[in-house]
């Protein structure tokens, strides 16, 4: 049975869902979104991501990230045009951060992480390699994604597969049914609106909330990714740095401010972020401190967090149109993108099979 599918949202979750669905030629797909790759708006989270693979799920919920790692690793090795490269990653933990109540994710700093068998070269660092003030550290090879290249690359893959993209704003998810480029009513809607699901009519998921993240993009380079579990500047701040592929600059961060909707960068916060980075990695600025950082831009985006975790499931609307939700990924949208999109495809296939059986 052929499906006419409308995907709402052109962040990494929506685009990846559309990509995997487009590999089945029975699906005719239209992506409709308020924001498209190339836009910079705080409510459009995907361009502001680092983006990298730093596992955040619990062991029981790790399958999405495991499946995504395999694909991102393949793209890094085989498809340089995707804008992904390998980079060594160091994770430094302070025991007091792990036990305190803060918005900073705790999963990456587990002393016995589930993902140690996902990375071939995972190792605990000797104490003399641990940053001062930290209690332990680990190291492994991860990937960093230049989102300014990767998101347009995804769009290119969609166009090659016959997917149509168009801008549009909907106030209610039911409106998506009439937005297919074919002119036919959609038989399936994929809701990948992220934080938009908080206000979207027909969804209005009050479990959604923003976690503001402020970063600085600089021309300086870091020779490896760095993550530190916390700071002395407040429970909602951490230290991280990574190099985007293909001249994308280094991302310096950052903050995890739950419930904060403000997308304007704060100069005081920016100074704290830069000061912390040059303190633990003075080499990034040539030993010149903050003055040695060549700033490209300051930015703040809203991570789409959800109480109870990501929502990846089907729902029937009152007119019996099926909606498949794929939103609420918080700060792990990229590193869970292919796993979640695979789940979307599996749900769509089950819906299709159910309709076929019903007609027999």
Which sequence ranges carry the predicted segments?
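Short beta-strand to alpha-helix junction loop
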Residues: 59-68, 137-153, 264-269, 336-337
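N-terminal glycine-rich dinucleotide-binding loop that anchors FAD/FMN and/or NAD(P) in oxidoreductases
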Residues: 44-70
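C-terminal catalytic lobe of FAD-dependent flavoproteins
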Residues: 128, 153, 287-360
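Flavin (FAD/FMN) cofactor-binding and adjacent substrate-gating region
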Residues: 70-162
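Glycine-rich FAD pyrophosphate-binding loop
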Residues: 23-45
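N-terminal Rossmann-like FAD-binding beta1-loop-alpha1 element of flavoenzymes
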Residues: 3-31
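Flavin-dependent oxidoreductases
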Residues: 16, 44, 176-272, 283-288
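Helical element adjacent to the flavin cofactor pocket in flavoenzyme catalytic cores
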Residues: 136-188, 192, 197-198, 347
């Amino acid at each position: 049975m052929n499906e006419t599918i409308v995907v709402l949202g052109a962040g990494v979750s929506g685009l990846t869902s559309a990509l995997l669905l487009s590999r089945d030629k029975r699906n005719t797909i239209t992506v409709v979104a308020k924001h498209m790759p190339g836009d910079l708006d705080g409510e459009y989270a995907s361009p502001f991501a680092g983006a990298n693979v730093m596992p955040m799920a619990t062991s029981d919920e790790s399958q999405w990230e495991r499946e995504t790692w395999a694909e991102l690793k393949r793209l890094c090795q085989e498809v340089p045009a995707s804008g992904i490269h390998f980079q060594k990653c160091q994770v430094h933990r302070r025991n007091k951060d792990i036990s305190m109540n803060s918005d900073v994710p705790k999963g990456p700093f587990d002393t016995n992480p589930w993902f140690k068998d996902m990375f071939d070269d995972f190792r605990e660092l000797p104490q003399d390699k641990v940053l001062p003030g930290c209690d332990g550290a680990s190291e492994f090879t991860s990937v960093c994604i230049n989102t300014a290249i990767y998101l347009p690359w995804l769009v290119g893959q969609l166009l090659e597969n016959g997917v149509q993209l168009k801008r549009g704003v909907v106030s209610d998810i039911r409106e998506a049914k009439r937005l297919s480029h074919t002119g036919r009513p959609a038989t399936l809607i994929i809701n990948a609106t992220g934080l938009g699901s908080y206000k979207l009519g027909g969804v209005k998921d009050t479990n959604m909330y923003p976690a503001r993240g402020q970063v600085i993009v600089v021309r300086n380079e870091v020779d490896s990714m760095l993550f530190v579990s916390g700071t002395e500047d407040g429970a909602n701040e951490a230290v991280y740095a990574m190099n985007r592929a293909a001249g994308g600059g280094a991302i310096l961060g950052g903050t995890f401010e739950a419930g904060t909707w403000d997308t304007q960068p704060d100069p005081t916060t920016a100074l704290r972020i830069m000061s912390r980075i040059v303190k633990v990695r003075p080499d990034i600025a040539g030993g010149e401190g903050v003055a040695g950082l060549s700033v490209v831009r300051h930015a703040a985006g809203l991570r789409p967090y959800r109480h109870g975790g990501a929502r990846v499931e089907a729902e029937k609307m009152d007119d019996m149109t099926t909606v498949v939700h794929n939103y609420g990924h918080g700060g792990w949208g990229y590193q869970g993108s292919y796993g979640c999109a695979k789940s979307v495809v599996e749900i769509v296939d089950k819906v299709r099979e159910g309709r076929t059986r019903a007609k027999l």
